[in-house]
Amino acid sequence: FNIGLDWGMWHNRLMFTAEYYYSKTTDMLYEYDVPVPTFAFDKLMANIGSMSNQGIEIGLSVVPILNKDMEMNVNLNLSWQKNKLLSLSGEYNGMKMSASDITPIGSLYGAGQNGGNNNVVYQIVGQPLGVFYLPHCKGLAINENGNNYYDIEDLDGDGNINLSDRGDRYIAGQATPKLTLGSNISFRYKLFDVSVQINGAFGHKIFNGTGLAYTNMSIFPDYNVLEDAPEKNIIDQNVSDYWLENGDYINVEHLTIGCNIPLKSKSVKSLRISASVNNLATISGYKGLTPMINSYVVNNTLGIDDKRNYPLYRTFSMGVSVQF
């Protein structure tokens, strides 16, 4: 279900919209292990799983200035969302079916990231889809050879460090943003105009796999390491929350400046020139290449910066528009 509110005043120079929604999806398709016999194959796709989604979307539109020579428009959209995997168990043709309540869905591979238990993002029943389930690193320790390694905490207190999926791990955050922001601001003064688009995401984490790989001196001892890699002198490839960072960011996505040039020509009705910049600036505490992964800008890595992603490039352009 969903419930919404639309409100406007001053001839809609101030407009506000709000909507709350909740949905529960059942009979989700999922792959299950089944016995042979009874079944012809050991895998079966069945509609059993369930998931809930809820959120709030808010929109605000303001026209604070509006006259012959000057105009300003401000639009802001906020979206908060919460997702939960409810169940993967149920019945199929009278037979009880169940799947693991903890399943890895995002891992690290390749040079500098092949230490073994390198699963990072999981689907866990009762949690949002895509959470970081990681060992806790207490800091760096020194081994007998004088090299640093990640000092992992024994979370279950059994006296052993177990990095497997059901070992010494905990839910350290989620990969998808809880809150997203979008804004468009435009301003006109006589013949000149400026517009800017801003987006942002908050409430999520990013695993800096680039930092993990290029700080590992055992893989890249003489080249392709980060500036502080020799000083840290880390000889370790195992994942942990040591490289888990806050993923919040605000990005100035687009900026355009234009001018409408007055003409006295009968053959040309109007002439406009403009200059634009894409991906102008990003404000973030993230130390990797870009925090804009697993967002609507680059949606392919589910919160993992795995050293294979190129940063979003900045582009400059100019335009001329002529109307005859």
Task: Please give the residue ranges for each predicted region.
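Outer membrane beta-barrel strand-and-loop segments of large Gram-negative receptors
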Residues: T17, Y21-L66, G139, D168-G173
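Residues on the lipid-exposed face of transmembrane beta-strands in outer-membrane beta-barrel proteins
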Residues: I3-W7, A18, I58-V62, S183-Y189, ...
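Repeated loop/turn-to-beta-strand initiation elements of outer-membrane beta-barrel proteins
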Residues: N12-F16, I56, N67-K68, L191-V194, ...
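C-terminal beta-signal and terminal closure region of outer-membrane beta-barrel proteins
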Residues: I48-N53, S100-K138, D222, I235-V239, ...
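Outer-membrane beta-barrel and related beta-rich outer-membrane complex signature
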Residues: M28-Y32, M70, W80-P104, H204-D228, ...
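Transmembrane beta-strands of outer-membrane beta-barrel pores
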Residues: Y20-T26, V62-P64, L78-K84, Y189-L191, ...
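Conserved small-residue
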Residues: V63-G173, N278, G285-G288
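Extracytoplasmic gating/loop element in the C-terminal half of outer-membrane beta-barrel translocons
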Residues: I142-E144, N199-L280, G285, M292-N294, ...
